[in-house]
């Protein structure tokens, strides 16, 4: 396994910040599975977010910089950070979370699975999809992608909903929800029908009142 001493941590970000004249305030070790890997905070956090977003989206740094539309960021500073970050990790033999995914894909080996279930698959970014499709699926006898495109909220993080909707030719759409009361469902449909890219669903919902469901 990976030695924890090799993981890029807070002390490393502090030292990197001193080298490039930037401040990192957010928790930089948050993983993709925990939500936002890309923190919005001090200047250093925003620059680091651009670096990591480019890698997870698998686009060039310049494209990510242009797509970010943050006029408080400067291209030259981003390039300086990118080089310093890469050089620091190489000199100190450190890995960040994205490095771990890239290394896993490059090595191309995983345990053998009889059944692989990819939960919350609507939230996978392009790099994660490569990990799933190129490494995990070939080592699995059967694969299920579980998710709900109506709950896809991480497009800002590079997630492409098309990747989830096209993940499998065979789809099973559940026809009953015990989570959402009918009153909430009725209201939500007026909003979600404005979304053009989505899986159509014919779902029946519980007739419990909203406050009864929330109390359970």
Please give the residue ranges for each predicted region.
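Accessory N-terminal region flanking or inserted into the helicase ATPase core
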Residues: 31-117, 126-131, 155
């Amino acid at each position: 396994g990976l030695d924890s001493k090799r993981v890029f941590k807070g002390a490393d970000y502090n030292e990197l910040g001193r080298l490039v004249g930037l401040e990192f305030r957010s928790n930089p070790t948050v993983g993709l599975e925990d939500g936002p890997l890309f923190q919005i905070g001090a200047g250093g956090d925003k620059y680091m977010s651009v670096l990591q977003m480019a890698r997870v989206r698998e686009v060039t740094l310049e494209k990510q910089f242009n797509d970010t539309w943050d006029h408080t960021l400067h291209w030259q500073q981003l390039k300086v950070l990118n080089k310093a970050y890469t050089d620091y990790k190489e000199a100190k033999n450190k890995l960040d979370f994205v490095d771990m995914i890239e290394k896993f894909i490059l090595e191309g080996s995983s345990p053998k699975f009889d059944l692989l279930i990819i939960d919350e698959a609507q939230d996978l970014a392009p790099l994660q999809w490569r990990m799933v499709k190129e490494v995990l699926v070939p080592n699995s006898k059967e694969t299920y992608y579980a998710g709900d495109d109506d709950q896809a909220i991480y497009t800002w993080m590079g997630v492409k909903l098309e990747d989830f909707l096209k993940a499998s030719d065979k789809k099973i759409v559940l026809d009953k929800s015990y989570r959402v009361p009918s009153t909430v469902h009725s209201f939500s449909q007026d909003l979600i029908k404005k979304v053009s890219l989505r899986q159509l669903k014919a779902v029946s919902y519980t007739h419990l009142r909203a406050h009864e469901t929330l109390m359970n």
